[in-house]
Design a protein with these regions (language model features):
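Fe-S-dependent hydro-lyases/dehydratases of central metabolism
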Residues: 1-172
Length: 172
């Protein structure tokens, strides 16, 4: 539109400092495999226009049972990253110091961080556990209390389908 063209017509103009900024060249983004902020998400790789068959969910395990009013911030938090959680462990394993973790909001461009943060809000209550808040569940058949991420990865290893139950206003 006219406003866009007006505002961005000089986007590549600037002073000598602006012109000295080094930036990769190319038509597409050059993904940095070492970045802990932005990673190339695998979700669309090998995707095509073929329709996938929808299968029945059978022999699934329950990953979590939530009550009412589970918000988007319970599901995908934007707050601080706990050093003792799966996302914190991932960042430490990638040589990020605890005081440099930043927040889930700042690291939304890294699917590895975000999937470890899913359901990790410190106030979420999984009714499968008594008197415990945070992103935890019970893994079956081991009966061990694990982070929701760690349990999900164990189930994935054995191709175990998962379900989550939640009350009204889920995702509001």
């Amino acid at each position: 539109s006219k406003l866009f063209n007006q505002r961005y017509k000089n986007v590549f103009s600037g002073d000598s400092k602006w012109k000295a900024v080094k930036a990769p060249k190319g038509l597409t983004y050059n993904w940095d495999k070492n970045s802990t902020y932005v990673q190339h998400p695998p979700f669309f790789q090998n995707m095509n226009d073929d329709k996938k068959e929808v299968n029945n969910i059978e022999k699934a395990r329950v990953l979590a049972i939530f009550g009412d009013s589970v918000t988007t911030d319970h599901i995908s938090p934007a707050g601080s990253i706990k050093s003792d959680g799966p996302a914190g462990a991932y960042l430490r394993n990638n040589k990020v110091k605890n005081n440099e973790f930043n927040s889930f909001g700042a690291r939304r461009g890294n699917h590895e961080v975000m999937m470890r943060g899913t359901f990790s809000n410190i106030r979420i209550k999984n009714e499968m556990l008594s008197n415990i808040e945070g992103g935890y569940t019970i893994h079956y058949p081991s009966n061990k209390q694990l982070s929701i991420y760690d349990a999900a990865m164990k189930y994935k290893k054995y191709n175990t389908p998962l379900v989550i139950f939640a009350g009204i206003d889920y995702g509001m």
